Amino acid sequence: MTILENIRQPRDLKALPEEQLHELSEEIRQFLVHAVTRTGGHLGPNLGVVELTIALHRVFESPVDRILWDTGHQSYVHKLLTGRQDFSKLRGKGGLSGYPSREESEHDVIENSHASTALGWADGLAKARRVQGEKGHVVAVIGGRALTGGMAWEALNNIAAAKDQPLIIVVNDNERSYAPTIGGLANHLATLRTTDGYEKVLAWGKDVLLRTPIVGHPLYEALHGAKKGFKDAFAPQGMFEDLGLKYVGPIDGHDIGAVESALRRAKRFHGPVLVHCLTVKGRGYEPALAHEEDHFHTVGVMDPLTCEPLSPTDGPSWTSVFGDEIVRIGAEREDIVAITAAMLHPVGLARFADRFPDRVWDVGIAEQHAAVSAAGLATGGLHPVVAVYATFLNRAFDQLLMDVALHRCGVTFVLDRAGVTGVDGASHNGMWDMSVLQVVPGLRIAAPRDADHVRAQLREAVAVDDAPTLIRFPKESVGPRIPALDRVGGLDVLHRDERPEVLLVAVGVMAQVCLQTAELLRARGIGCTVVDPRWVKPVDPVLPPLAAEHRLVAVVEDNSRAAGVGSAVALALGDADVDVPVRRFGIPEQFLAHARRGEVLADIGLTPVEIAGRIGASLPVREEPAEEQPA
């Protein structure tokens, strides 16, 4: 049996002699490479936190001590050390989540996987324990990149204000190529004032502040001015301690002994402490280290030796179609600029950045700032394209409403991973945008059904300069081209039977599902018209009179049923005095468990068979004319 196989709970880890810890680290890395390449998942981040996670569980008493993982994609090692070693169905239906999960273990606390939130959670948990007289430590592990999020600094400000509140912040800094000098630094927890890496660590602190929206630059200037001329002008020690936080580090995050010593020192301090650990993303796996883009942040199913993908691809992804088209548009229009929030590659803007480096900005974990900055860019005469994951736009709703829409700014939002994303679980599904954004005056929302319409509707969107526009598309590969038979107003007619009784309104990617549904209904003697509204907000004015020609309207969307496109269509029909019932098919008002997209859609009834069955059962009974009675 391996050392790892004998670890069933954190106390088993504490019993290990120090000389076995290095061997355990290697076993964990081998396990991760073989397991994650079989299922897909976050590989690079977890390879980088092996020793750090071991040290955390040797020093603290989870779950009495609460260990919080910001974002949570680096929690695989934590799962292994807390009794969850069956990774055979990682991120699959019935298997382990790719993020912490309270349903899985009492050792997990935060499962939302949205960055920069852990420090706020830690602040609240620590205060709750103090109020209720409970013992135990609260430890928040946050990445250096997540410190660019404004929420993290709001939390730091409040944490620092409670000077007698024991709370430990571990910064997992894996975004720099430098490493601390080992020896006196690691063993004695000294500062870097006398080491060769001193200036680099100062640059880290300066960089974090200067990339932090709104408060970062003034805070940096204030600290610089207060200590100007002193040897430690930009020292992380000075920055964080001026905020009221004890600073320990930087520590070699791959030296278990050094990390344990730092954590024990922090544990003894009766107040907030920040422990700065330097780690290497992808450590121990050469292909990850050699991967310049993101050190295998996320991988699909692949051969661990050759790194060749083993899962078949069905063509280009929605993201790549957008990425190619925005480059073409950028070449035609010098006013087109782009913004993203720490997602340059995932949202398809890498090629745009290569081609137009002075016209793209990665603002960090700062969706709110992205939206407001876009309003400024638009007011200044440019047309910004803000590309983010659909689930993360929730953070910028107020800014989209009050800064972009209220001022009628020509900003285009591009939402990647819209609808059901599947294996990434509850917090990554982009299933709320078409509901939340229905209330934004002047906003136009496009839901393309295929690659051609991503290109066409993106061009239509960036042509609008007096109001915000939004285009949304899902994850994974684009399906086949879906041609239109006709155009009625702004609607594309995709299917029309001779005597249609049902009007199927297909929202974006659900067009193929609706076409298959129409075939099933036709086999049952029920004729259909299938239309793609293309722009789902506002409702096209030709839709109500078209609906009046049918006995039932069914709206099928990859979005919440609550207040979504179906609700907007029903409202439009009511306003037009069209008395035709509307059936809404969408995502129920619940959080969705992780599974493949097709499995999730089947579970919630968004399949052709299920939709056709429910439409057939709910179609109003046709009233036959009464027969005349003989005289």
Swiss-Prot record:
Disulfide bonds: none annotated. GO terms for molecular function: 1-deoxy-D-xylulose-5-phosphate synthase activity; magnesium ion binding; thiamine pyrophosphate binding. SMART domains: Transket_pyr. PROSITE patterns: TRANSKETOLASE_1, TRANSKETOLASE_2. Signal peptide: none annotated. Optimum pH is 9.0. Its EC number is 2.2.1.7. Thiamine diphosphate binds at H73, S113, H114, A115, N174, Y285, E367. Mg(2+) binds at N174. Binds 1 Mg(2+) ion per subunit. GO terms for cellular component: cytosol. GO terms for biological process: 1-deoxy-D-xylulose 5-phosphate biosynthetic process; isopentenyl diphosphate biosynthetic process, methylerythritol 4-phosphate pathway; terpenoid biosynthetic process; thiamine biosynthetic process. It holds the Pfam family DXP_synthase_N. It is an enzyme of class 2 (transferase). Keywords: Isoprene biosynthesis, Magnesium, Metal-binding, Thiamine biosynthesis, Thiamine pyrophosphate, Transferase. Pathway: Metabolic intermediate biosynthesis; 1-deoxy-D-xylulose 5-phosphate biosynthesis; 1-deoxy-D-xylulose 5-phosphate from D-glyceraldehyde 3-phosphate and pyruvate: step 1/1. Optimum temperature is 42-44 degrees Celsius. Its cofactor is Mg(2+); thiamine diphosphate. Homodimer. Catalyzes the acyloin condensation reaction between C atoms 2 and 3 of pyruvate and glyceraldehyde 3-phosphate to yield 1-deoxy-D-xylulose-5-phosphate (DXP). PANTHER family: 1-D-DEOXYXYLULOSE 5-PHOSPHATE SYNTHASE-RELATED, 1-DEOXY-D-XYLULOSE-5-PHOSPHATE SYNTHASE, CHLOROPLASTIC. This is 1-deoxy-D-xylulose-5-phosphate synthase. It comes from Streptomyces sp. (strain CL190). The gene is dxs.
